[in-house]
Amino acid sequence: SIGAHADKKIGIDGEDATTGVTSAVEMLRAIGDDEMPDYTGKRVVVIGGGNVAMDVARSSVRLGADKVSIVYRRRKADMTALPEEVEGAEAEGCDVLELMSPVRIEKDENDAAVGLWVQPQMISRIKGGRPSPKTAAKDEVLIPCDLIVVAIGQGIETRYFEEHGVTVKRGTIEALDTSEIKERKGIFAGGDCVTGPATVIRAIAAGKVAAANIDEYLGYHHEITSDVEIPYAGYEDKVPCGRVEVALRDAADRKKDFEPIEYGFSCEEACQESGRCLRCDHFGFGSFRGGREKQW
């Protein structure tokens, strides 16, 4: 359970430029370590359409970038980023260049990136639930820039595992439904290193599956019980209320710093919003209908 902390390469000519090309993982890690890069006056191009790409773009604005462009090969409507993230990026001055597929990186005589060539796209057949892009009959476009940030996803470090005989397929470790690694008896894997980057809840679920099967592999059959009594949850005195939306700081102010962009709830709003809880832990919901289990 090692997560996915390595960057993914886009695989185009010029990506190996000595300066002017970096990854979202590298950039955001530096910010997290309080080693803020200086983008003052720079033109930044971000490649990608997910939440991480929006984080990179909005962070670039806060680091002083003069212009930030987000390049995505599909439509803006097809972006995997949350709509509020895309709206927030645009409100803070980022340009979204949709239907533009990166082709190669332009470099100068010093091997520094000075621009990104993109090929205009058009929407084609629907595959996997969303329209696929295809090359449009238009000329390539050069986007001049000082820095290109690749934000197309994360991967895992597999080399050391492969060297020790662990089966790796398409960048992830192959594991059985029991979480045991194929042909490696007694070794288990789960989370992002098996599924690829996913949600926290999927990683937690994988951990629970692995724990149960490791327990059985070791010859035990432990059972976990809960003696916590959950108080009755009644709705007799509850008045139905609408959702309280969180207020945002003005884009012109929030883009100047890394402080929270939301104001948060007032005491009154917090009390009202918490009163809307459906108490799924008590009653259960959907496939979990029936409430909390006493033993598992």
Please provide the spans of the model-predicted regions.
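Glycine/serine-rich phosphate-binding loop and adjoining beta1-alpha1 elements at the start
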Residues: 1-30, 275, 279-287, 293-296
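Short hydrophobic core segments
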Residues: 1-3, 45-47, 144-153, 270
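N-terminal glycine-rich dinucleotide-binding loop that anchors FAD/FMN and/or NAD(P) in oxidoreductases
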Residues: 15-24, 30, 81-108, 115-121, ...
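FAD-site-proximal beta/loop scaffold in flavoenzymes
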Residues: 17-41, 126-197, 238
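Rossmann-like NAD(P)H-binding beta-loop-alpha module
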Residues: 35-66
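A conserved FAD-binding loop/helix module that cradles the flavin
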Residues: 56, 190-224
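Rossmann-like dinucleotide-binding cores of NAD(P)H-dependent redox enzymes
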Residues: 57-104, 222-235
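Mid-to-C-terminal Rossmann-like scaffold of FAD/NAD(P)H-dependent oxidoreductases
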Residues: 88, 101-108, 112-113, 124, ...
